[in-house]
Amino acid sequence: MFKTILLAYDGSDHAKRAAAVAKAEAQAHGARLLVVHAYEPVPDYLGEPFFEEALKRRLERAEKVRAEAMALTGVPREDALLLQGRPAEAILQAAIGEKADLIVMGTRGLGAVGSLFLGSQSQKVVAEAPCPVLLVR
């Protein structure tokens, strides 16, 4: 039934539970599991050298989250995508581009401080997704 399952992952407890569900679904269906982690762009108004430092920290954090997702799901690096942008938009673009048959994500994320999913991001994905969305609490 499912050929490609997209896991939206932000490192929150909800996302960790979603990772377990996505992994199980991928195994049950013999599907490819793709992990997407979206991070917010650094505001331009920071200026040098603050912009460079903020970008470096944001990328380091994103790499850490990706590594955690890879460890939880067993997906190879080429199937663990880091995308810059608003989480919902990045997830939706990845789902379309990768022809996802199912999106799995937590119902809530880490919030704006972590520059990751909010409940509103989950709602946007559900409303605009090109495929079914499985929300995990």
Swiss-Prot record:
Signal sequence coordinates: none
The protein's name: Universal stress protein in QAH/OAS sulfhydrylase 3'region
Pfam families for the chain: Usp
InterPro entries attached to this UniProt entry: Rossmann-like_a/b/a_fold, Universal_stress_UspA, UspA
Species per Swiss-Prot/TrEMBL record: Thermus aquaticus
Family, per entry: Belongs to the universal stress protein A family.
